[in-house]
């Protein structure tokens, strides 16, 4: 992570030395709170399944922080769910997704709203198990219903609340030399 143009200049040669290209690409690092947002699209409209905090730690100075825990539900779920659903509905419309999963990773800064960094028509790996632990919604059954019983899938999604009664978290362990 470069915090200034002076940092970029100081690290340019060592960074360029690790590349086969004669240029570097850089992107702005968003240091806002990061979220995993699982939605389910029903008739073109996004419904929030879950919003989880992606908690991160930088293990060394100048390193991009790495995720160490995904905690369900985020304390900001009630505050962010309408904006998240609106964004996911726009994404679904853009790609033509009418029914099924759509997951979004996004950053949030107070006063700036959500900034999407990734969206995919899938569920978040093992995290569907945390949704089941926290809310009781079986994502596996929802996926099966999505294929074999669309009315049942729709009913499951419309009856679901992302404001879980139980907290659940997935931990990530990192090894460093």
Question: Where are the regions that the model predicts?
Answer:
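A general structural signal for well-ordered secondary-structure junctions
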Residues: 21, 98, 152-153
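ATP-dependent carboxylate/phosphate-activation module, predominantly the ATP-grasp catalytic core
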Residues: 28-97, 101, 108, 120-147, ...
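Peripheral (often C-terminal) accessory segments that flank ATP-dependent C-N-forming ligase machineries
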Residues: 145-177
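Alpha-helix boundary/capping residues
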Residues: 14-19, 91, 146-150
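Residues at or immediately flanking beta-strands
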Residues: 23, 103-105
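Amphipathic, soluble alpha/beta structural segments
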Residues: 11, 15, 108, 169-177
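Conserved protein kinase catalytic/activation segment
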Residues: 112-115
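Rossmann-like NAD(P)H-binding beta-loop-alpha module
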Residues: 1-49
């Amino acid at each position: 992570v470069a915090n200034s143009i002076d940092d970029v200049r100081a690290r340019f040669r060592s960074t360029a030395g690790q590349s086969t290209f004669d240029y570097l690409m850089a992107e702005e690092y968003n240091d806002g709170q990061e979220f995993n947002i699982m939605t389910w699209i029903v008739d073109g409209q996004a419904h929030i399944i879950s919003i989880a905090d992606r908690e991160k730690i930088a293990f060394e100075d100048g390193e991009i922080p790495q995720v160490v825990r995904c905690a369900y539900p985020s304390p900001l779920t009630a505050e962010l769910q309408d904006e998240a659903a609106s964004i996911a509905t726009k994404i679904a419309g853009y790609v033509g997704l009418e029914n099924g999963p759509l997951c979004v990773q996004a950053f949030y800064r107070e006063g700036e709203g959500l900034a999407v960094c990734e969206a995919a028509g899938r569920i978040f790996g093992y995290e569907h198990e945390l949704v089941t632990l926290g809310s009781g919604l079986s994502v596996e059954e929802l996926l099966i219903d999505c294929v074999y019983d669309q009315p049942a899938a729709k009913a499951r999604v419309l009856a679901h609340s992302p404001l879980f009664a139980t907290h659940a978290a997935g931990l990530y362990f990192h090894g460093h030399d």
